[in-house]
Amino acid sequence: MAPGMSGRGGAALLCLSALLAHASGRSHPASPSPPGPQASPVLPVSYRLSHTRLAFFLREARPPSPAVANSSLQRSEPFVVFQTKELPVLNVSLGPFSTSQVVARELLQPSSTLDIPERLTVNWKVRAFIVRSHVPASQPVVQVLFYVAGRDWDDFGVTERLPCVRLHAFRDAREVKSSCRLSGGLATCLVRAELPLAWFGPPAPAAPPTARRKSPDGLEPEATGESQQAELYYTLHAPDASGGCGGSRRGAGPGVGARAESPTQHPLLRIGSISLFRPPPRRTLQEHRLDSNLMIRLPDRPLKPGEVLSILLYLAPNSSSPSSPSVEHFTLRVKAKKGVTLLGTKSRSGQWHVTSELLTGAKHSTATVDVAWAQSTPLPPREGQGPLEILQLDFEMENFTSQSVKRRIMWHIDYRGHGALPDLERAVTELTVIQRDVQAILPLAMDTEIINTAILTGRTVAIPVKVIAIEVNGLVLDISALVECESDNEDIIKVSSSCDYVFVSGKESRGSMNARVTFRYDVLNAPLEMTVWVPKLPLHIELSDARLSQVKGWRVPILPDRRSVRESEDEDEEEEERRQSASRGCTLQYQHATLQVFTQFHTTSSEGTDQVVTMLGPDWLVEVTDLVSDFMRVGDPRVAHMVDSSTLAGLEPGTTPFKVVSPLTEAVLGETLLTVTEEKVSITQLQAQVVASLALSLRPSPGSSHTILATTAAQQTLSFLKQEALLSLWLSYSDGTTAPLSLYSPRDYGLLVSSLDEHVATVTQDRAFPLVVAEAEGSGELLRAELTIAESCQKTKRKSVLATTPVGLRVHFGRDEEDPTYDYPGPSQPGPGGGEDEARGAGPPGSALPAPEAPGPGTASPVVPPTEDFLPLPTGFLQVPRGLTDLEIGMYALLGVFCLAILVFLINCIVFVLRYRHKRIPPEGQTSMDHSHHWVFLGNGQPLRVQGELSPPAGNPLETVPAFCHGDHHSSGSSQTSVQSQVHGRGDGSSGGSARDQAEDPASSPTSKRKRVKFTTFTTLPSEELAYDSVPAGEEDEEEEEDLGWGCPDVAGPTRPTAPPDLHNYMRRIKEIA
């Protein structure tokens, strides 16, 4: 999330040259329009969600409705939030602009049944488990466990504010209610409701006391006879003032048709149905036959550690038959295995004489019991009589560490006078000893769904699991560390070896609505069912332009990361060439394309069926570009390359596949073709729009209660003084495609923004991009944007312009009822031949001249490539006047000193020129003229002297040039007016002179050394009608020295224009000095 922006408030001018391509962090780039030519540009904002655990941006599979259509000033983006602990924050940014909005709770959970005040319950679901689906009349209690799925188990702060759950059991028109409150780290509670006996059917016939038969799930004996059905529902309600939920309540009584309470105000949510039955009467003891004469009886229930077990020995009926051995005297040998201790024996009847001997060993204990008939009469026949009780044996169950164990007791009978029974006929009694009397186990997952993004990222997605046990007395225990587990299909879902979480690793190939993992505890087992969503393959890859071409006239520097394989050169040589010539080391720019990857998460409805269920419905595509960004590949890196995770650029002509590969197996998850053509396109239009601020709004997406639609609108009007604005820039190509300027690196171009009316708005360069600053109210095409090639590729003294465009601007102080939208579709002005046009001036790159049609002076500010990220601006565009910083004060003071120095220099020059301009030349006949100043004197000779009237005073260090006669002189010898001229000596020996009078004369130096000199001498004119003339310095060529021409014919004579000797010598000396 972008931090809160500070500094100069308000909006700023967007140089999209430094926008989305350099945006930070896992911001979510705005999705481009569907592939193909775009009719108009789209506001290139970037969305980013924070404070979420699992969320996706979406796109409609069908064309968007007009309500969500995008334009150059509006951008809509749907998204969905699956998992979050707090309210998400949506940030939208455009260059330096950024605004955020908290997603309202009503948008995240529009119809949540689990409502907790001041608590976010997104994706929370109340799950209900029926402990026993068959309820016997002997235990007429229905038990239902409730827990909250989708909640973070580490979130302990909410446990004190969880609601109550009320169970409603209905049988015909009768109802029974019972409540409990969700609590604890797992947010669970167990509801127990006692059912009336009238709800159960008639009793079933009695069954013999045989060994207990268990149902397949090991929870309950199978019901026999006809069962009755009862329906279970639940409601949620807030606890009372004391924090309780109220006890169980029953209807008006058995058989009464009306309910005792008014219907609840909360919606009834169905749980399921249970079966009610009357089991046959069952004895509490189970019988085991030791042989045909003797039997034992023991309790029909599991045993607990430390419990004393009493086993009774009986003489079975029909035991005195002729085939049976005599039972009047026998010896019973008992061996108890480790974990069972034989405490003692005692006679249960005076008719039997019992003596015993006990031996306790390290591994087992044994007892030898001698039993004899105590009466003098023989044992009477037992036909038709019940069992005869003989003796009682007491055993103690020892402690153990496991949850349940099996203990064995071996029985051996030796009849006196008869051989022992074969070993195979020896009886063995097996006892079950348990730590707790568990009637059911239930696996609970923190969430009921898994979105298998591991297929795309290679990162495991895991869901924690807890297994709880429910005892007969209603106690709930955590037995997660004591269970065993196994996945029914590891191609869908897996489970950890410690059974503490289920996961997907990315190697799965399908999903399921009821993926099952089985957990086992002792003889009990229970399944955990999950919904697993997998991405639909192949992935859908969208390119904004699948055919990339070179752009005419757009030259960019050849950099190592862009250079084609065929053009690779030594980097040092390239840098040297770039310094030598701006046209070398550059190549034509290739078009760029944005890319996005979409998919749909789906699953199968049930095992063995092909019915496909799509998450969020078939109308939505989920964007997964960020998830697969590390696994994108360009098939041929010589043809194209990836600028970043969302941009492709061409390198050389060819066709290459662009694909997304699996992070685990390198299999191709999605693929599309990219073509780089040899054809060239030109920039037909540069489109620019002013963006003064951004407005973000959130609302439910039409037709879907789960998705949210974010809409960003750009405001164009600058509404207060010194407000800053930015530009949104788009390029239109001759092939019909458009692209934001932000797709291209700022080092590949230059952007010049000029203000055509500085009274209304100015352009400044405070940051890494130009900003438009409001100065006064006004509207119209007050700005001008000019796109040029990179400075390193500019030709000498030329500026190659790619495109120009006027930009509409409106400054109105005060808030309008609605912000008018300006659209300036007028074509830009690209240079001929793809924009390689020279600018209207010879200034260096980066300077700008006002457009000829501009109504006032224009200023320009070139865009330089930014070297750092955008500086922060205030979130929400709260703009306030700012004071000058210390740095700015120092810079302004330094600028003022420079301006003052320049002003003083100019005033001095003007005074100097005006002072000597009005001096007059002395009258004719004066023998000397004093030159009051000489700008330059360089030479090795002595001051020159010229004979006659042309000689200067002795005090002058440099002689003056001879005066020419005026152009309208008379042959009668009227007085000639001398003018002092400017003599400009140049390094090549040439000099500029008057258009009418130019002459050359050789000059000789009176010294042995020669130097060339530039000097200028000013003097005054005798009248305002006279103009300055130039006296040229002679060439070194001897032939030219002999052909000097003069403007006064009476000086050289009527026949041949030759120079007087004195003047000839004078000119030669000047030549030598020059």
UniProtKB/Swiss-Prot annotation:
Residues 1-25 form the signal peptide. It is found in: Membrane. GO terms for cellular component: cell body; membrane. Residues 841-862, 972-984 have a biased composition (Low complexity). Residues 202-226, 241-264, 563-585, 814-867, 946-1063 are annotated as: Disordered. The chain crosses the membrane at residues 894-914. The keyword Repressor does not apply. Residues 26-893 are extracellular. Required for normal inner ear hair cell function and hearing. It is linked to TMEM132E is located in a region involved in a heterozygous deletion of approximately 4.7 Mb; this deletion, involving the NF1 gene and contiguous genes lying in its flanking regions, is observed in a patient with 17q11.2 microdeletion syndrome, a syndrome characterized by variable facial dysmorphism, intellectual disability, developmental delay, and an excessive number of neurofibromas. This is Transmembrane protein 132E. It comes from Homo sapiens. The gene is TMEM132E.
